[in-house]
Amino acid sequence: MLQEVVYCGICSYPPEYCEFSGKLKRCKVWLSENDTELYAKLYGNEIDEEVANAANKLGSSSIGEAREEKLEKDLLRLQAKQENREQRELAKKLSSKVVIKREARTKRKFIVAISGLEVFEIDMKKLAKTFASKFATGCSVSKNAEKKDEIVIQGDVLEEVEKYIHSLLEEKGLKNVKLEIIDSQKKKKKPTDEANSNNNNNNNNK
């Protein structure tokens, strides 16, 4: 009757030859866990301290590998979640718009109000200071009718503000964001200009 030959799961040698594999400690651990009778035959009934320590280390290593694998999966999941959130934020930004409005004030003076910038994580107060310095005029941040922050600039600087906001958004990679320009009251001709224009037309008709 043929006797079944056992081969070590670590070095693939028969257990009797594991000492020549250079992996004896791990081989003994494997054998103690998979064939206690053969282990007892080769090494005695008691598992020596060295084998027990090796078994503990291997166990810890397995736990460490499992933990590392779990951490890696969690990290990938968090990265995917972060990417999805960033994509949603970008879509929100691209679908938003910045409103630049020119309004007439008394004595033929104008103000320019800018709203909608908070979506793009722009520091409104800092930008207001930049405008105040750039245009040498009064500039402040206040709440509009929709209870949202808007920058109010004293002066007729609509075109300059539009160009500046365009370049500011382009720097943030948002050149496709819509700018809505509202001119609530076009600049009117001075009465003297209108009178002169009418006189010229009358003279030409003579």
UniProtKB/Swiss-Prot annotation:
<dbReference type="GO" id="GO:0032790">
    <property type="term" value="P:ribosome disassembly"/>
</dbReference>
<dbReference type="InterPro" id="IPR036877">
    <property type="entry name" value="SUI1_dom_sf"/>
</dbReference>
<dbReference type="InterPro" id="IPR001950">
    <property type="entry name" value="SUI1"/>
</dbReference>
<dbReference type="GO" id="GO:0005737">
    <property type="term" value="C:cytoplasm"/>
</dbReference>
<protein>
    <recommendedName>
        <fullName>Translation machinery-associated protein 22</fullName>
    </recommendedName>
</protein>
<dbReference type="InterPro" id="IPR005873">
    <property type="entry name" value="DENR_eukaryotes"/>
</dbReference>
<comment type="subunit">
    <text>Interacts with the 40S ribosomal subunit.</text>
</comment>
<dbReference type="GO" id="GO:0005840">
    <property type="term" value="C:ribosome"/>
</dbReference>
<dbReference type="InterPro" id="IPR048517">
    <property type="entry name" value="DENR_N"/>
</dbReference>
<feature type="region of interest" description="Disordered">
    <location>
        <begin position="184"/>
        <end position="206"/>
    </location>
</feature>
<keyword id="KW-0687">Ribonucleoprotein</keyword>
<dbReference type="GO" id="GO:0000184">
    <property type="term" value="P:nuclear-transcribed mRNA catabolic process, nonsense-mediated decay"/>
</dbReference>
<comment type="similarity">
    <text>Belongs to the DENR family.</text>
</comment>
<dbReference type="GO" id="GO:0003743">
    <property type="term" value="F:translation initiation factor activity"/>
</dbReference>
<dbReference type="Pfam" id="PF21023">
    <property type="entry name" value="DENR_N"/>
</dbReference>
<dbReference type="GO" id="GO:1990904">
    <property type="term" value="C:ribonucleoprotein complex"/>
</dbReference>
<dbReference type="GO" id="GO:0002188">
    <property type="term" value="P:translation reinitiation"/>
</dbReference>
<keyword id="KW-0689">Ribosomal protein</keyword>
<keyword id="KW-0963">Cytoplasm</keyword>
<dbReference type="InterPro" id="IPR046447">
    <property type="entry name" value="DENR_C"/>
</dbReference>
<feature type="domain" description="SUI1">
    <location>
        <begin position="98"/>
        <end position="169"/>
    </location>
</feature>
<dbReference type="GO" id="GO:0001731">
    <property type="term" value="P:formation of translation preinitiation complex"/>
</dbReference>
<dbReference type="GO" id="GO:0003729">
    <property type="term" value="F:mRNA binding"/>
</dbReference>
<dbReference type="InterPro" id="IPR050318">
    <property type="entry name" value="DENR/SUI1_TIF"/>
</dbReference>
<feature type="compositionally biased region" description="Low complexity">
    <location>
        <begin position="196"/>
        <end position="206"/>
    </location>
</feature>
<dbReference type="Pfam" id="PF01253">
    <property type="entry name" value="SUI1"/>
</dbReference>
